[in-house]
Amino acid sequence: MKPVIALIGRPNVGKSTLFNQITKSRDALVADFAGLTRDRKYGDATYQNKSFIVVDTGGIGESEGGIDNYMAEQSKTAINEADIIIFVVDARAGLLASDEQIARELRTLGKKIYLVANKVDGVHAEAALVEFYKLGLGEPLQVAASHGRGVQQMLEDVLQDIPEDENPEEHDKDTGLRLAIIGRPNVGKSTLVNRLLGEDRVVAFDQPGTTRDSIYIPFEREGRKYTLIDTAGVRRKGKVDEMIEKFSIVKTLQAMKDAHVVVVVVDAREGIVEQDLHLIGYALEAGRAMVIAINKWDNMSEYDRKQCKLDVERRFDFIPWARIHLISALHGTGVGELYPSIHRAYESANLKVSPAKLTQILNDATDQHQPPTVQGRRIKMRYAHMGGQNPPTIVIHGNKVDKTPADYRRYLENVFRKVYKLEGTPVKIEFKTSENPFEGRKSQVDERTAARRRRYIQKFKKAEKKFKR
């Protein structure tokens, strides 16, 4: 499981700015998918081959109920589930009573805590940080999050005990195809897991959220290894407090990052709700292959089934490549048909093609439909190669390719999808502009050679005039 780092601190100390610096997520990564909104309170991050999940827990200490109520009702749940805590303070504002109260609470938890003093730009750092030593959390790490200063050094200190990511091929040998079953509470995730396994391996009750944590279940089917990941339920706001919901989502993110294929389970009777779309958004951001299972399809009237199908077509139109199955996990209807779609999604997500073949397809595509012009000059796409798997990433090099509009990018994606029959996975296309190797290089010609060239040019011009006469 990916480690979780929680950003803690009172309001306006710069946690969100620091979050953006760590995750590089000022713009939503799924912005290309129309109608999909994201709460940017949590995100994936990688630093020096170390992957982790970071959470901005919101401001502490200024709520109406006071620090104790806030810690009891919201933050304690979040902090208890974090592996590392970054306690952010404001170097400009200095040490406040609420900082001291938060520090007292944090010290009782036995967690690894790093004190980070933000906004050190524009102040005398040594003088400003002296008072923070009384918090008893060691030497403050200095950052200026708005400028990105000190963030890399902070990450090196914070992540020093976090191991580097495993070799994916070695991990795959042990676990086989890793399949994450995700969805809101009570949509039938655990029932589906039990049906896929053929036995009651996971306790499943009618109470939402009965699966308390992600459960990893290895099994074999028809000679093939699998690991099923049953995730804790993602709750609706209003049913439980915000922090619990946020960390339920973090558990889902952890499972997604560890999976090859994600099965998103939706309740046909409740219909498609925003949280279902958010879950799909998380899977897209993680770049994971995906299969949609519309569960509880049994005992629905013909009218309700028709309305559900229309809703599915309308709400899921931004992922036309995802296979959608109508199932009943309880009775097993349609469950067996999930496996072919899961295998196809897995194979598509792990596409491997030689640069020569990719470049040939690229050339055929650009010959058939030329790239547009930018500032009077046509975009030139020269060659392509694979940049990674899960999701399949195609890197295209050329001149001005970084100016490629979204509609032409989609055209290229559709071409690659059609040629390689890619189903059930997002396809990532990256553009890299070829650099001029001589750009910015000073001329090595000395003054004597330059003068000789000027004389030749003058001589040529005189000869040209004489010839014209």
Swiss-Prot record:
GO terms for molecular function: GTP binding; ribosome binding. Residues 3-166, 177-350 form the EngA-type G domain. GO terms for biological process: ribosome biogenesis. Keywords: GTP-binding, Nucleotide-binding, Repeat, Ribosome biogenesis. GTP 2 binds at residues 183-190, 230-234, 295-298. Residues 351-435 form the KH-like domain. CDD domains: EngA1, EngA2. It comes from the Bacteria. GTP 1 binds at residues 9-16, 56-60, 118-121. It holds the Pfam family MMR_HSR1. Belongs to the TRAFAC class TrmE-Era-EngA-EngB-Septin-like GTPase superfamily. EngA (Der) GTPase family. Associates with the 50S ribosomal subunit. GTPase that plays an essential role in the late steps of ribosome biogenesis. This is GTPase Der.
